[in-house]
Amino acid sequence: MPSSAEIGLTAAQFEAEFPFYLQVGCDGAIGRMGASLARIMPPGPAGFGERFRVIRPEMTADFAGLAAWGGKLLVLESRFEPVVRLRGSVQLQPDGRSALLLLSPWITRVEDIEALGLSIGDFGAHDPAVDLLFLQ
C-alpha cells in the first residue's frame, strides 16, 4: 500500500471530484476555478477578496488569512449576483505560493440548487449536497 505521501489525483480526477474549487495565489488572485463554480459565477475581478467575502470565520479575504486558516472549515459568499454561499476547507499548497479551497455550495433548500441552475452532474460524486435533490 502506498504511503500517504504518494496519494494523489490526476488533474481530471481532481476536477471531477471538486468542481467548485478555487485556487488562490499568494498575490490574492484567483488562478483557477472548478468548472461548476465558473459556470455559475459571473465575470468579474480576478482578486479573491473582490469576488468573495468570508462569512466564517471572521477574517480578511486575502491569501494571508486563508493560509493561516489552512485545513479548517470556512464559509464564503460571492459579492455578485447570483449570490452563492460556499463551504469547505483551505489547503495550503506545499510551495506556499497558493491555496486550494475545496468548496461546495451551501445548499439548504432544493430551490437554492434550482436558482443557481445546478444539477446532479455539477457536483462531485462524494458531495452530500446532491442528497437534497433526492429528498424532495
Locate predicted features.
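Sensory/regulatory domains in signal-transduction proteins
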Residues: 20, 27-121
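PAS-family sensory modules
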Residues: 1-24, 98-136
